[in-house]
Regions:
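ATP-dependent carboxylate-amine ligase
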Residues: 1-18, 36-41, 47, 51-54, ...
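Short, basic phosphate-binding NTP loop
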Residues: 2-109, 116-127, 145, 152, ...
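Residue-level signal for inorganic ion chemistry
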Residues: 9, 40, 59, 93, ...
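Non-catalytic positions within long, well-ordered alpha-helices that form the structural scaffold/packing
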Residues: 56, 60-61, 177-178, 389
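Short, polar loop motifs at secondary-structure junctions
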Residues: 67-74, 225-228, 247-250, 400-404, ...
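Phosphate-binding loop of NTP-binding sites
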Residues: 76, 89-225, 229-238, 433-434, ...
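Active-site regions of enzymes building and remodeling cell-envelope glycoconjugates
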Residues: 77-86, 239-246, 256-259, 410-418
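Acidic-glycine-rich active-site phosphate/pyrophosphate-binding loop
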Residues: 118-122, 258-276, 323
Length: 470
């Protein structure tokens, strides 16, 4: 699909100028010098460890249509858009491209569960219009490079779209939301994330409100009615349609447009359009909450209840997010392994422990350090150790310096280990057997998937001897 001419592309970017033939048109946008090719506009991004301008001679040899750069080598002949900052230009161009398309676009943010909610919505949209007619963020391409590249994938055949907005510093959500131009803004929750950079949970909630502020007057805001910070999002949505949601139980009922009750994997949903009974394939109350968020967003985008049900029931766990696997190593063979290794913060750790607590004994928590917790690190880790003990978890195995505090708070039955090899060896020696359930979780830098890989392989592997990353 032909995108912009260089003249039209430069018009989307403040301060841009064109050298060479400005009538040249491009078909795709690339930021990877290794895969750029004919028909591409190559955008040279400067990163922390590289500068793609250094690879422009190789890019020229790949016969790209044009480049977008801050500078060019001497004797450069490939048509070019010149800008002061290529990263900002990438976003401006993506914003211009997104505005070529009039379709429902859902933007998802929140402290925990946003990738799962995004994937649930993508599954619902695929059920509604087919996978080829819906655009969805691939993986977690949710930052100021990943989101523009996602938006550049929009084409005329798309009828629905869902994108994920990531954040770890103040102001990022506002920037990304302006690029996305959402018609539906989803805030899944506000919890203790990125506390090294976001001083309070209220600051997190206000940051997430930026996606609602990016709505046009015709847009719809989606958020949990029972969240402590719902009032912030309700004020942000003044003048917009609101579809709020709540997961209720015998102890607590919250009035909301979309309400659900959950028992094991059976989710009963009441909506303004009617009732749904959905059998989820994923674990935990928090995934029932995620399903209500996805349902609300889909309703806002005009999707039928039938497609919502089909999409939710066909949805499986996202990699590294409460994936159920089976141990195969030694005495652990046959044990259930819950792989929740993608990332961790105090609230997602507590939610995962709740899932573990619902299983039969022996229940084993295998945890790594939680990152980006700032000065609250010791207190947060002690909280998790104490919570695991309170919820009846039978044993705690921890790796990483900060997790020593979790072991101290847990008390008897806690084991702190130096590396993955020692951890796996101790798990085998403990003799938990096939009836056990192991929950493995930690922040991304801990690479706790190495533990999962080790225990789900019938033979010891190289991951078992790799020291923990710090």
């Amino acid at each position: 699909m032909t995108m912009f001419s260089l003249r039209a592309a430069a018009a989307q970017i403040p301060g841009a100028s064109v050298t060479g033939d400005d009538s040249v048109r491009f078909e795709r946008v690339s930021t990877d010098s290794r895969s750029a090719g004919p028909g591409d506009l190559f955008i040279a991004i400067k990163g922390d460890r590289f500068d793609a301008h250094d690879f422009l001679p190789q890019v020229a040899e790949r016969n790209v249509a044009a480049v977008l750069v801050a500078r060019t080598p001497e004797n450069w002949s490939v048509p070019a858009i010149r800008v002061a900052d290529t990263r900002e230009a990438l976003g401006a161009l993506a914003r211009g491209w997104r505005r070529q398309f009039d379709l429902p676009l859902v933007a998802v943010t929140g402290s925990n569960g946003k990738t799962t909610v995004k994937e649930m919505i993508a599954s619902i949209f695929a059920a509604a219009v087919g996978a080829d007619a819906r655009l969805a963020t691939a993986g977690n391409f949710n930052n100021d490079i990943g989101l523009p590249l996602t938006l550049f994938r929009l084409h005329a055949a798309h009828r629905l779209a869902v994108v994920e907005l990531g954040m770890n510093h103040p102001g990022e959500t506002e920037q990304l939301a302006k690029l996305a131009g959402p018609t539906v803004a989803v805030v899944n929750n506000a919890q203790r994330e990125h506390q090294e950079f976001m001083a309070t949970v209220e600051a997190v909630a206000l940051e997430h409100a930026s996606v609602i502020h990016a709505l046009s007057p015709e847009g719809t805001a989606v958020f949990p009615a029972d969240d402590a910070y719902a009032s912030i999002w309700r004020v942000a949505a003044t003048g917009n349609r609101i579809i709020d949601f709540a997961l209720n139980n015998a102890e607590r009922t919250t009035e909301a447009a979309v309400q659900g009750t959950f028992d094991d994997k059976r989710l009963s949903i009441d909506t303004p359009q009617g009732h749904l009974d959905v059998t989820l394939q994923v674990l935990g109350n928090h995934n029932a909450h995620n399903a209500l968020a996805a349902t609300s967003a889909a309703l806002a985008a005009g999707v039928s209840l039938d497609a919502i049900q089909r999409g939710l029931e066909s949805f499986g766990a996202v990699k590294g997010r409460l994936q159920v696997k089976q141990a195969a190593l030694g005495s652990l063979a046959g044990a259930t392994v819950i792989d929740d290794t993608y990332n961790a913060n105090p609230d997602s750790m507590r939610a995962a422990i709740d899932v573990l607590a619902s299983r039969e004994s022996p229940r084993v928590l295998v945890m790594g350090d939680m990152g980006e917790v700032g000065d609250n690190g010791p207190a947060f880790h002690r909280e998790i150790g104490a919570y695991a003990k309170e919820r009846g978890i039978d044993a705690l195995y921890a790796m990483g310096d900060a997790s020593r505090d979790a072991c101290t708070a847990y008390g008897a039955g806690a084991h702190h280990v130096a590396d993955v090899g020692a951890l796996v060896a101790q798990l085998q020696q403990a003799g938990f057997g096939a009836a056990a359930t192991l929950l493995v979780k930690g922040s991304r830098f801990m690479q706790m998937e190495r533990v999962v890989d080790a225990v789900t392989s019938p033979q010891p592997n190289a991951a078992g001897s790799t020291p923990a990353a710090h």
